[in-house]
Amino acid sequence: MAPTLKQAYRRRWWMACTAVVENLFFSAVLLGWASLLIMLKKEGFYSSLCPAENRTNTTQDEQHQWTSCDQQEKMLNLGFTIGSFLLSATTLPLGILMDRFGPRPLRLVGSACFAASCTLMALASRDTEVLSPLIFLALSLNGFAGICLTFTSLTLPNMFGNLRSTFMALMIGSYASSAITFPGIKLIYDAGVPFTVIMFTWSGLACLIFLNCALNWPAEAFPAPEEVDYTKKIKLIGLALDHKVTGDRFYTHVTIVGQRLSQKSPSLEEGADAFISSPDIPGTSEETPEKSVPFRKSLCSPIFLWSLVTMGMTQLRVIFYMGAMNKILEFIVTGGKERETNEQRQKVEETVEFYSSIFGVMQLLCLLTCPLIGYIMDWRIKDCVDAPTEGTLNENASFGDARDGASTKFTRPRYRKVQKLTNAINAFTLTNILLVGFGIACLIKNLHLQLLAFVLHTIVRGFFHSACGGLYAAVFPSNHFGTLTGLQSLISAVFALLQQLLFMAMVGPLHGDPFWVNLGLLLLSFLGFLLPSYLYYYRSRLQREYATNLVDPQKVLNTSKVAT
């Protein structure tokens, strides 16, 4: 039986910690495809496609000797293409399903699919000459399972209030760092552990995710902190008052009730409802403003549209470098010259493999740097108050002696939505500056400088996902979060398809020289500053509106009688 939302709230730290571990070892593990490809080739997957006369390489273990060829790699990469496509393209339907049914069923399905994926790979490795086609189904299930686990974990930060963006960044960081998983698995494989044992063990661990979800994840979705209070409520004559209600807020409620009593006398049949009703207290209405926002308004909002441009451009920049990195390193080492001797070829290959391994290890930086951008998104949120509304009393004003009829001294508060926009501006500006710095590092043909490019690439890859997730959680209703995030991921994946054309241009007409492609992408990177620029404009407009509504408290008390 699924736990209640209240029970899940008490277990939120356990759920968050286990979700980070689960994302790290079970989400986007296909991003470490290079290591998995080596293991699959050693196990002999599609080795039958390699005729003896076309043999390009031979790998040998204690019992078998398998051949390797271009046809084998093309077939295996086709499986990777399918799996990686599902890893990104299914985000939109998953977002719609999660908004409708909550994260629990999707997480159960995802963990089951991951276990099935590992089991299929283990079974197929027993007789690769016959069962090699199972790798397509296994990789497809792996990609689908990864996005299910990742997507559902992004709802957990809603239970952490003002730290929501920080925990969301931690979830995205563990997802981005999962590229290190297959390189780690390969180390175990190289130590002599059979591939079948590794896959069956991994499948068993995935079953623990299923069990953890069944025991701890509630059936309903996690509402945003602005939409529900997970903490204990105190019932008072049919009215749910938060135990943290401030004196000013209670004074506002009593004033409104007093104004209602001055207009009519309640009958006995009306009971206590005539004196006290939940809508009189700000933030306790049954239907929150966020719930009433139509999805079309969120979809067509300028913030979402500009985020599509920024995220699509950044995704293209990041994915192109991941796909073309080996060729870029090779061009830097050789200077564009042909390798004439076997010794030169071997030296180039060793250098490229060394730097590629460094790049793989650096993926763990995502786990360390993503919380930083989340901290930026959460900066000073806990010190903020809700926005004022026209014709109502500002809860966080300093009333002084207003209740005694004396002059009122007014204090301008810091509003939550304005602060969230400020934090988003800072986060996206920092990310875009790092992206431009990464582009400049790519233009310089220096091998050691590529280490800086590795660091900047890894940080940007974690930052821009975390910043976007924090922005969506801060600006849009929580019931739109899954669909909007899924749509953004799908459109970004379409943008990323252009990297294949850029790669073909680099190895074809440009003869392996990445300079012009990197220059074009660097210029394109400046489009990323359009989103924080619009957020700055939107924040200024919002501040003017708040300043207009921020009227004198005594005037509000006098005019509220007319409103009632």
UniProtKB/Swiss-Prot annotation:
<dbReference type="GO" id="GO:0015820">
    <property type="term" value="P:L-leucine transport"/>
</dbReference>
<feature type="transmembrane region" description="Helical">
    <location>
        <begin position="165"/>
        <end position="185"/>
    </location>
</feature>
<dbReference type="Pfam" id="PF07690">
    <property type="entry name" value="MFS_1"/>
</dbReference>
<feature type="transmembrane region" description="Helical">
    <location>
        <begin position="20"/>
        <end position="40"/>
    </location>
</feature>
<comment type="similarity">
    <text>Belongs to the SLC43A transporter (TC 2.A.1.44) family.</text>
</comment>
<protein>
    <recommendedName>
        <fullName>Large neutral amino acids transporter small subunit 3</fullName>
    </recommendedName>
</protein>
<feature type="modified residue" description="Phosphoserine">
    <location>
        <position position="267"/>
    </location>
</feature>
<keyword id="KW-1003">Cell membrane</keyword>
<dbReference type="GO" id="GO:0015818">
    <property type="term" value="P:isoleucine transport"/>
</dbReference>
<feature type="transmembrane region" description="Helical">
    <location>
        <begin position="451"/>
        <end position="471"/>
    </location>
</feature>
<feature type="glycosylation site" description="N-linked (GlcNAc...) asparagine">
    <location>
        <position position="396"/>
    </location>
</feature>
<dbReference type="GO" id="GO:0005789">
    <property type="term" value="C:endoplasmic reticulum membrane"/>
</dbReference>
<dbReference type="GO" id="GO:0015190">
    <property type="term" value="F:L-leucine transmembrane transporter activity"/>
</dbReference>
<feature type="transmembrane region" description="Helical">
    <location>
        <begin position="490"/>
        <end position="510"/>
    </location>
</feature>
<dbReference type="GO" id="GO:0005886">
    <property type="term" value="C:plasma membrane"/>
</dbReference>
<keyword id="KW-0812">Transmembrane</keyword>
<dbReference type="GO" id="GO:0098846">
    <property type="term" value="C:podocyte foot"/>
</dbReference>
<feature type="transmembrane region" description="Helical">
    <location>
        <begin position="357"/>
        <end position="377"/>
    </location>
</feature>
<dbReference type="GO" id="GO:1903785">
    <property type="term" value="P:L-valine transmembrane transport"/>
</dbReference>
<dbReference type="GO" id="GO:0015188">
    <property type="term" value="F:L-isoleucine transmembrane transporter activity"/>
</dbReference>
<dbReference type="GO" id="GO:1905533">
    <property type="term" value="P:negative regulation of L-leucine import across plasma membrane"/>
</dbReference>
<keyword id="KW-0813">Transport</keyword>
<dbReference type="InterPro" id="IPR036259">
    <property type="entry name" value="MFS_trans_sf"/>
</dbReference>
<feature type="transmembrane region" description="Helical">
    <location>
        <begin position="131"/>
        <end position="151"/>
    </location>
</feature>
<dbReference type="GO" id="GO:0015179">
    <property type="term" value="F:L-amino acid transmembrane transporter activity"/>
</dbReference>
<dbReference type="GO" id="GO:0015807">
    <property type="term" value="P:L-amino acid transport"/>
</dbReference>
<feature type="transmembrane region" description="Helical">
    <location>
        <begin position="303"/>
        <end position="323"/>
    </location>
</feature>
<keyword id="KW-0325">Glycoprotein</keyword>
<dbReference type="GO" id="GO:0005304">
    <property type="term" value="F:L-valine transmembrane transporter activity"/>
</dbReference>
<feature type="glycosylation site" description="N-linked (GlcNAc...) asparagine">
    <location>
        <position position="558"/>
    </location>
</feature>
<feature type="glycosylation site" description="N-linked (GlcNAc...) asparagine">
    <location>
        <position position="57"/>
    </location>
</feature>
<feature type="modified residue" description="Phosphoserine">
    <location>
        <position position="398"/>
    </location>
</feature>
<keyword id="KW-0029">Amino-acid transport</keyword>
<feature type="transmembrane region" description="Helical">
    <location>
        <begin position="78"/>
        <end position="98"/>
    </location>
</feature>
<dbReference type="GO" id="GO:0016324">
    <property type="term" value="C:apical plasma membrane"/>
</dbReference>
<dbReference type="GO" id="GO:0015804">
    <property type="term" value="P:neutral amino acid transport"/>
</dbReference>
<comment type="function">
    <text>Uniport that mediates the transport of neutral amino acids such as L-leucine, L-isoleucine, L-valine, and L-phenylalanine. The transport activity is sodium ions-independent, electroneutral and mediated by a facilitated diffusion.</text>
</comment>
<feature type="transmembrane region" description="Helical">
    <location>
        <begin position="424"/>
        <end position="444"/>
    </location>
</feature>
<feature type="transmembrane region" description="Helical">
    <location>
        <begin position="515"/>
        <end position="535"/>
    </location>
</feature>
<keyword id="KW-0597">Phosphoprotein</keyword>
<keyword id="KW-0256">Endoplasmic reticulum</keyword>
<feature type="modified residue" description="Phosphoserine">
    <location>
        <position position="262"/>
    </location>
</feature>
